[in-house]
Regions:
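N-terminal beta1-alpha1-beta2 submodule of the flavodoxin-like/Rossmannoid cofactor-binding fold
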Residues: 1-102, 162-196
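Short, glycine-/small-residue-rich phosphate/pyrophosphate-handling segment
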Residues: 108-150, 167
Length: 196
């Protein structure tokens, strides 16, 4: 059975660099045999604001929570807005508080690959750091490689969504591989312990 890698990333702008970066990293996991689901900008923009005092959930909210619940790994991409995570991405992450009572709480035991796109290196670095802090707080394992892409430096993607920057494409492929490799190893470790 193939592993499920869930991608969360995008903006309200169709074809945003953060959405395309997450798609590129997910494609690398697919090439190595993973199944993927991507929650992009349009989907994320339609989610209601997370309100912990309101337990009712829309079908879209339930779909996101259930996908992350079933995920063997995640790839999260955010634009760097004013040095931090976009509200769209943070709202989706906040919704995952619904996983607090699960046997596998939040991101527990899962690798989380992180991608940041911004029009400048400062926002890239601060946003990546913020995302790593969030993943740690949610008991996830940020991958060793976090990808930051400066959209002011070069054209990152072609009109068809193909990554135009070779170095960026290589980094996104490596990120996807790290997430999937961790999922494979983590799944094998409990089986080895049970067999011992």
């Amino acid at each position: 059975m193939s592993h499920l890698i869930v991608g969360i990333g995008g903006t309200t702008r169709p074809g945003s660099s953060s959405e395309l970066a997450v798609r590129t990293a997910l494609a690398a996991t697919e090439r190595s045999g993973a199944r993927t689901v991507h929650f992009g900008g349009d989907f994320l923009a339609a989610l209601p604001h997370y309100a912990p005092e309101r337990p009712e959930r829309t079908d879209e909210q339930k779909r996101l929570v259930e996908a992350v619940r079933q995920a063997d790994g995640l790839i999260i991409g955010s634009p760097g807005y004013h040095g931090g995570i976009s509200g769209l991405i943070k709202n989706a992450i906040d919704l995952l508080e619904d996983l607090r009572d699960d046997q596998r709480v939040y991101f527990d035991g899962r690798a989380v690959g992180l991608v940041v796109t911004a029009a400048g290196w400062q926002a890239c670095g601060t946003t990546l750091s913020a995302l790593r802090n969030v993943v740690h707080a949610m008991r996830g394992w940020p991958t060793p490689l976090g990808v930051t892409l400066n959209s002011a430096r070069t054209r990152l993607f072609e009109a068809d969504g193909t990554c135009a920057d070779t170095a960026a494409a290589d980094q996104l492929a490596m990120l996807g591989s790290q997430v999937h490799d961790f999922a494979l190893r983590h799944a094998a470790a409990p089986a080895a312990v049970r067999a011992a």
